[in-house]
Curated annotation (Swiss-Prot):
Free-text domain note: Consists of 3 domains; the N-terminus binds the ribosome, the middle domain has PPIase activity, while the C-terminus has intrinsic chaperone activity on its own.
Record-given protein name: Trigger factor
Alphabetized PROSITE patterns for the sequence: FKBP_PPIASE (PS50059)
InterPro entries: PPIase_dom_sf (IPR046357), PPIase_FKBP_dom (IPR001179), Trig_fac (IPR005215), Trigger_fac_C (IPR008880), Trigger_fac_C_sf (IPR037041), Trigger_fac_ribosome-bd_bac (IPR008881), Trigger_fac_ribosome-bd_sf (IPR036611), Trigger_fact/SurA_dom_sf (IPR027304)
MF terms in GO: peptidyl-prolyl cis-trans isomerase activity; protein folding chaperone; ribosome binding
Catalytic activity: [protein]-peptidylproline (omega=180) = [protein]-peptidylproline (omega=0)
UniProt GO cellular component terms: cytoplasm
Similarity annotation: Belongs to the FKBP-type PPIase family. Tig subfamily.
Keywords in alphabetical order: Cell cycle, Cell division, Chaperone, Cytoplasm, Isomerase, Rotamase
Organism per entry: Lachnoclostridium phytofermentans (strain ATCC 700394 / DSM 18823 / ISDg)
Length: 428
């Protein structure tokens, strides 16, 4: 195997990789062994026909695709290792030459890790945050706890109000025709949850049990179902039941029930303390973000589009995994929000770019400041990770490969870089 590297600019390179004719023939043989049992050749039992007979019958290129799938990954990885390129995105593969008895040639266009030229990263100026917890914020937090301890009661003597849980039957029509997925029975809808599109929920406020309501809405222009996007719709809705949350009184008895305190004032003081700690933590994070933004602004780097695309895909996969843990699929999320996959991915772009820029400048600070992580610090981090995963440290170490360990160490070094630039920043 041989290769050459061509710099395409903007941190993109093109590898032209050539596998020998002998290696390509070995890959064809692998493909033959994989597929021969699936091929019918007159005069031979399945799996017994010689390769030459199959190639004559089906064409000399019958095994080329599978052979390429065998040879490309191995040759690509070898070229990356030997070239010592720091690849940061999936390669774009293009087969240049595939011919029996000849070398197999393909190209791989890849994004490589950008070089960062740091500007000022110590003593950057950021706005100072003032930490204050108001009485209104304390009462809002208290109301959250009251709502968590509320009970649901059936309401029969009034119309629908905001925050009610309304049981409805509904059917949707576009241009007078019912559409797929637009019908539901005994659906429990919380008014104000924005679970349904447009002003659907608002139009139920003031309606009574047993009332038939015509709700007029317009689907979002970016709605996931293209045949409905941007179209007006009529929903025929029947209000079947109204339920409301009944909150407990905010008094000493309530404070004693939900906390270790005997009086409401003591409990409110504890809520204030918790809110202050939360605001302190948020202010620390906001300061770190602001400082990193300044460091990015002062630095010079060129991010290839392929690197951003890879980050977007990773973020989408992470988001889908979080949804799955909540019992939802990405498709259901699109349905609820009216987004489509293309818009969703586009929306991830700025955040993906910011993550990449942040990581690159912080790794550059790690290098510039010669930041290191001790063995003791690594062991402590692994112990905390093992505890979080509820496994033995030795078992975790077995599961973590060398690359994963290097990533953990770099993550720790990056956090030290954040602490450094934040501590050196000037609050004005």
């Amino acid at each position: 195997m041989s290769f050459k590297v061509e710099d395409l600019g903007k941190n993109m390179v093109k590898l032209t990789i050539e596998a020998t004719a002998e290696d390509f023939d070995k890959a064809i043989e692998q493909a033959y062994q994989k597929n021969k049992g699936k091929m019918n050749v007159q005069g031979f039992r399945k799996g017994k026909a010689p390769r030459a007979i199959i190639e004559k019958m089906y064409g000399v290129g019958v095994f080329y695709e599978d052979a390429a799938n065998f040879i490309i990954p191995e040759a690509y990885e070898q070229a990356i290792e030997e070239s010592k390129l720091d690849v940061v995105a999936r390669p774009e593969i293009d087969v240049v030459q595939v011919e029996k008895g000849q070398p197999f040639i393909f190209t791989a266009e890849v994004a490589v890790k950008p070089e960062v030229t740091l500007g000022a990263y110590k003593g950057v100026e950021v706005s100072k945050s003032e930490i204050e917890v108001t009485e209104d914020e304390i009462m809002a937090e208290l109301d959250k706890v009251r709502e968590q301890n509320s009970r649901t009661i059936t309401v029969e003597d009034r119309a629908v109000m905001d925050k009610d849980i309304v049981t409805i039957d509904f059917e949707g029509f576009v241009d007078g025709v019912a559409f797929e997925g637009g019908k539901g029975e005994d659906y429990a809808l919380t008014i104000g949850s924005h679970s349904f599109i447009d002003t659907f929920e608002d139009q139920l406020v003031g309606k009574n049990i047993g009332e038939d309501v015509e709700v007029n809405v317009t689907f979002p222009t970016e709605y996931h179902a293209a045949d409905l996007a941007g179209k007006p719709a009529l929903f025929k809705v029947k209000v079947k039941e109204i339920k409301a949350k009944e909150l407990p009184a905010a008094d000493d008895e309530f404070a004693g029930d939900v906390s270790e305190f005997n009086t409401l004032e003591e409990y409110k003081a504890d809520l204030k303390k918790s809110l202050t700690e939360k605001k302190d933590k948020a202010a620390k994070t906001a300061k770190e973000d602001a400082v990193v933004d300044k460091v990015i602004e002062n630095a010079t780097m060129e991010i290839p589009d392929a690197m951003v695309d890879t980050q977007k895909r990773q973020m989408a996969e992470d988001f889908a995994q979080r949804l799955k843990m909540q019992g939802l699929s990405l498709e259901q999320y699109f349905q609820f929000t009216g987004l489509n996959p293309n818009t969703f991915m586009e929306n991830l772009g700025p955040q993906a770019l910011k993550r990449i820029q942040s990581r690159l400048v912080l790794e550059a600070v790690v290098k510039a400041e010669n930041i290191t992580v001790s063995v003791e610090e690594i062991d402590k981090e692994l112990a905390e990770m093992a505890s979080a995963y509820q496994m033995e440290v030795d078992k975790l170490k077995e599961l973590i490969g060398e690359k994963e360990k290097e990533q953990i160490v770099m993550d720790m070094a990056v956090q030290k870089a954040i602490d450094l630039v934040a501590s050196e920043a000037k609050e004005v």
